[in-house]
Amino acid sequence: MFLPVIREILVYFWDMLTVKVFEFNPVQENTYVLYNEEKSAIVVDPGCYFENERRQLKDFITENQLTPTNLVNTHCHLDHVFGNRFVAETWKKPLQIHERERLVLDYAPISGEQYNLPFENYEGEIIYLKEGDVIKLGQDELQVIFAPGHAPGHICLYHAKQQFLIAGDVLFRMSIGRTDIPGGNHNTLIRSIREKLFVLPDEVVVYPGHGPSTTIGFEKANNPFLAG
């Protein structure tokens, strides 16, 4: 009679998410694949632009026998959405974004032409996420945090049990997201960081949309854009 309880305890402590990062496209964007022991996976911000990058992502998922269950964008600037269509068509998954990113997504191909990076945009079903939503991957839960400022509908994904945050372009190591772009607002971004991210434990590992990982505590103490 105690076996189900024991199994639940073991699953809670041992069924950990693995975070795999790829650096893709000319903007050096971080694409994330989060997966558990049951081989279920979430693809976040697939920035794979070139064919060899798409092949690299597919080979990793295939070789590790993963089954993508979710396709999520933290925001829809072009460098984070290049691979949306590829992932959706390969694994038959709809795109999940905040509703305020829909116009940003629709505008992405125009940005691509401006930067000489043309691409085929995602045109399938969209599932809208909001603050407080939970994305489940087996026993694991990722909490959706609404953190606008860099983009109007920017979200972050927080895993409380393992204390990590997929931060997109909100917070970087010793830096913050740009706000000198359409939909950006510096004061809103600073407020998002202070009120949504800096309330998390100092030990939380931050996986950003570009560059190396950091921690909440390190950025509180050292980020020059957030001093004072």
Segments from the language model and where they lie:
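Short, low-complexity, charge-dense intrinsically disordered segments
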Residues: P4-L10
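Conserved beta-strand hairpin/beta-sheet module of binuclear metal-dependent hydrolase folds
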Residues: W14-N64, C156-A167
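Short Gly/Pro-enriched turn/cap motifs at secondary-structure boundaries
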Residues: F22-F24, G124-I127, F146-P148
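Conserved S/T- and glycine-rich ATP-binding loop of Class I adenylate-forming
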Residues: L34, T74, A147
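Residue-level marker for buried hydrophobic side chains located in beta-strands
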Residues: I42, V72, L95, I166, ...
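Active-site HxH/HxHxD metal-binding segment of metal-dependent hydrolases
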Residues: C48-K136, A221-F225
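Metallo-beta-lactamase
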Residues: C48-Y49, S111, D140-G228
